[in-house]
Amino acid sequence: MPLDNKVQLNENGKEVNNNNNNDEDLKIQDNHNNKEPFFNRSELVRLLIQSLNSLGYDKSAEFLEKDSGISLQSKEINQFSECVVSGDWNKVEELLPFLKLNEFDTNNVKFLVYSQKFLEYLENHKIKEALECLRLEITPYTKDTSRLQVLTSLIMTSNSSETKKQIKQRSSRVNLLDDIRKYVNPNIMLPENRLEQLIKQSIQYQMGKCLYHNTSEQFINLFKDHTCDKSQMPLDVLFTLKDKHRDEIWFITFSHDGQRLASSSKDNTIIIWDMSTIYLDQPTEPKVMFILLGHTKEVSHLSWSPNDKYLLSASNDSTVKLWNTNDGTLLKTFTKHSDAVTCCGWHPDNKRFVSGGNDKNIYLWSIENLDLTNSNNNNNNHNNNNSNINGNSINGSNNNGNNNNNISPIKSWACARVNDLSIHKDGKQLIIICQEKKLRIYDLENEKTPEVVLMETDAITSMELSNDCNFALVNTSNQEIHLWDLEKQIIVQKYRGHKQGRFVIRSCFGGVDQAFVLSGSEDSTIYIWHRSSGILLETLSRHSGTVNTVCWSPCNPFIFCSASDDQTIKVWSRSNNHNSFINNLTNK
């Protein structure tokens, strides 16, 4: 059919073709292989008209309508949209039949329209009219009493500043039109910015299939398919931090702002490193800020508070210690556990934390009412057999601090030996892994809520939550890493290739949008997988002992660190050493 022929739409928005040729659906032919595409030509033209309008090319859109003979929408639908935006509610109701809705959806749309009318009455302080609208127009079209209660409460508190703010936020005619579109056949009323949505979906699909996608570019070239090469991946060692820890390094973790790194070792010590210099255009080797002494046995786990003011350390000496990260002083020692403490983690309120251990107990602690002034009078004297290494300040103590033994947890849970734990970013759930091959999820706000149990087939040694806390990486003893969807409660991906059987090996998410999974291994190698596909991308062999733990910088997708039994920490970056990066990535 030639483009200048008039095309009519039926009542369902479908094209009516009055010609008798074989091109019934006006489909575009592929010039290369003469195959028909999967879309209708008139739909594409309508999307182009809509896009031209949204870009401000109204005259071009009008010309395309005339030249093609295809209308974006029927005149009644256009009039309906105009009336919604202008607030002509009587005309809106009159034009409702042209939306071709069933009775249920018609009632829902009427409820939306009358609710908008009600909110505008309140916004203009027309309380009497709002009450009449609620009683005569809104109530007949919903059986959901909770929705009515919300609107009624707005009347009762209409003079409060908070209610006025809510009314203003709710009473948007543009938002109303978007809500109405959800009920209408898209052939009749096109979804807003539909062509742009399709382009975004295409780009997101290409990015998802791009194995090495690790870029923060805001704009993607529409003239070619998106691909990334290895140049954006941190595959080269930038620095090797050595001669500070004197035994195996078991744990490392970045502060939330990425400017510091904490490491713990079998040598009973904790080191806080200044990492700010690795992000410079000309990076320099990180320096030791503090060496924290005080534990009498191996330190197996560390956790920064959400505001990075405090650091928790969990040790095989059965204690948890709380440190001031600004000066390295020991603030408190928590001694409730009767066996090695294997893990600890903060609540997002910065006031509470949890600890778990081999004594089969989990404790919830609060520091809110504790005296967190320097609890150790010897901290600032640098005695207790501490020495100053390379001029770096060393703080810490073998004392437990004043009255530490009187600190009691505010809550406890009994379970099997605890291997790892974490608190959801909303503070409502505690996720733990035990030696009984289970992930357990506890409700921290409601004790009556039954725990959720996710079963594994092998022992679970460690766990890492994604930034959105919807997914958990768990390392298992059968040399697999499993990605759990915590909402759907299923394993969505498995990662294989690394070696793990004798030791605790830790993995992490990393890169832009956490698109990669990174893990240490007992074969002295680091493994990198594509998160969504599970494809093994890289193996990095620069350590000379078991790689126990890895962590990716939270503020730069081109930096990660690894720690090993070889007593070193390696800082990894891109080969071109372009480490400067806008440190404003939002921590999810």
UniProtKB/Swiss-Prot annotation:
Domain CTLH: 73-129
Pfam families referenced in this protein's UniProt entry, alphabetically: LisH_WDR26, TPR1-like_2nd, WD40
Residues in LisH domain copies: 40-72
Listed CDD domains: WD40
The keyword Repeat belongs to this UniProt entry's keyword annotation: yes
Gene Ontology CC entries for this record: GID complex
Keyword vocabulary terms for this entry: Repeat, WD repeat
Entry-linked PROSITE patterns: CTLH (PS50897), LISH (PS50896), WD_REPEATS_1 (PS00678), WD_REPEATS_2 (PS50082), WD_REPEATS_REGION (PS50294)
Swiss-Prot/TrEMBL WD repeat ranges: 244-283, 294-333, 336-375, 413-452, 455-494, 499-539, 542-582
Protein name in UniProt: WD repeat-containing protein DDB_G0349043
